[in-house]
Amino acid sequence: WDVDYVMMPILLGFIGYIASIVGVFSMAILKNGDDPAVALRNTTFIGAGLFWLGGYGAIQSGLIGVEMGIMHSVVLGSIVGILIGLVTEYYTGIEPVMGVKTKAIPHIGEMSKTGPATNAIAGLSVGMMSTFVPVVLIALGILGANKLGGDTYGLYCIAMAAMGLSLIHISEPTRHKT
């Protein structure tokens, strides 16, 4: 193995932490808008964009000599992570998510009017439905990362996609406190 493939996760971790910190601090600028949920969502997009630029920049500049498909799999993992976050926001919120009006929580609230049994059934069904899309997204992310890695780097690309997925959510717990 080449040392660059060992150093790639370490370098991406560093880039991801820096991008997440910048994303968290961007909340100070974005929170002055009308919708705080949009500002929170945009901090994730800012962090992801900086993470992608830093990763591609490190490869293009020759700082780390790895196949470009590996960085593509990291971006794929990041996109899967962002989509999972949006799906979670859809199923747990009452505000529209990127223009799509949610019906999950209002449906549970409506079922509460008829009694505790229908409330429990509605909550259970929404909870079960909310896991379907993330599972499909993760499966597609695994398949896509394996395809990007080919026969040589397939498993490595799956691991790097998982790293991209997790680095996007580093700022999630901290951004809610700003």
How does the language model describe each region?
Residues 1-171, 175:
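Hydrophobic packing and interface segments
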